[in-house]
Amino acid sequence: MEIQLINIGFGNIVSANRVVAIVSPESAPIKRIITDARDKNQLIDATYGRRTRAVIITDSSHVILSAIQPETVANRFVISREHQSVEN
């Protein structure tokens, strides 16, 4: 299996193979997930001080905050998958 990487903004890159969900941070359950991850030292803040617009949840229970829209991250995820299938 080849490693696929997704740019989540400001030069930060995440392994696409480890992503479970890309969600918006506005709902109360997602805010609780962020708080729990912060308490467990499993939160990665990749916003560079900007407003959090996307929350990426990984299979290792790490939570990554990004300053770009969830739709943008999802589109990059899909493009990455399509690019790999074209190469094979």
UniProtKB/Swiss-Prot annotation:
Q: Which residues form a coiled coil?
A: none
Source domain of life is: Bacteria
NCBIfam families, alphabetized: MtxBflmRegRemA, PRK04323.1
The family this protein is said to belong to? Belongs to the RemA family.
Q: Which HAMAP family match?
A: RemA
- Name-wise, this protein is Putative regulatory protein asr0105
Q: Which organism is it from?
A: Nostoc sp. (strain PCC 7120 / SAG 25.82 / UTEX 2576)
